[in-house]
């Protein structure tokens, strides 16, 4: 039985990030004035063939329309598997779910040209799940002159704000981004995106380069526990060369992705450093992520007392230690922990955010923070594909 806000109910959120290893999903109940209640979670991996196809689509090539359409169909099939697992583990039927918020797989992000492309066949996903699908969240923000990213700060403000301290939520996915939550906020139940004190933007590369390097040299999909980096030593000359990138000097609002920070970018930066052992490069890439995040926090949130990390990088203790060291080196007395310390497992944060954006869509409430993205104002985000 519905109570509270008409949009209240159970929502699914699906997120497949720039690591492209699979899709994380959550089933969550939203009720106005109450914190989100997670009912179940699931992860469904991508086959190497799908992953390779997605990577290939990030660079211009032949027959892109056909390849994109087939990859979108394959993504929808994997997303549907994740949804069926959420239904099973939460003991739900499709009719019990108000909507499914799905991010899709970013293959191009060019807000300066007025578009962003998150691959997914939302119509097929609705057909396979018999659940309303809400997708294409970023395009409306871009249409309003924004970056279309990051979109998670509004959700972060909803669940992670504090009345007593300035907090930073740092997502260490393929790309790193931060949300700055000044003291005086607090968990707000259904949340309010209209908060011009909330700030955030993309910082630079994180697991996109760290994973690419370990896969190249160890044939592993990620640096498990940061062990590869721990074997190496940071090369300060290489680090300086990596930091010599115009994006890092660009003012917010700003966003980035694999369009810039990819293997070609890294190989160009490594010219002249072929003598370095692979583990030293890995240590330096880890230091790059820590340095770029710490620089942005120092620049925009000098009064920060706590940094809460989510995303795949939250499972890398070497990266977390490097971030704490980089913050201290910049004079910040900020503790580093994962969002688990605030009651939300780090692997759930982004998929929860897209479930929340679906909830906001059904409420016809804004999902972006225009001071974060640079959009002309707050907008209802997403497009509906009925069951």
From Swiss-Prot:
It catalyses: 1,6-anhydro-N-acetyl-beta-muramate + ATP + H2O = N-acetyl-D-muramate 6-phosphate + ADP + H(+). Keywords: ATP-binding, Carbohydrate metabolism, Kinase, Nucleotide-binding, Transferase. ATP binds at residues 17-24. It is an enzyme of class 2 (transferase). The keyword Nucleotide-binding applies. Pathway: Amino-sugar metabolism; 1,6-anhydro-N-acetylmuramate degradation; Cell wall biogenesis; peptidoglycan recycling. Pfam families: AnmK. One of its GO terms (molecular function) is ATP binding. It comes from the Bacteria. One of its GO terms (biological process) is 1,6-anhydro-N-acetyl-beta-muramic acid catabolic process. Its EC number is 2.7.1.170. Belongs to the anhydro-N-acetylmuramic acid kinase family. Catalyzes the specific phosphorylation of 1,6-anhydro-N-acetylmuramic acid (anhMurNAc) with the simultaneous cleavage of the 1,6-anhydro ring, generating MurNAc-6-P. Is required for the utilization of anhMurNAc either imported from the medium or derived from its own cell wall murein, and thus plays a role in cell wall recycling. HAMAP family: AnhMurNAc_kinase (MF_01270). This is Anhydro-N-acetylmuramic acid kinase. It comes from Burkholderia mallei (strain ATCC 23344).
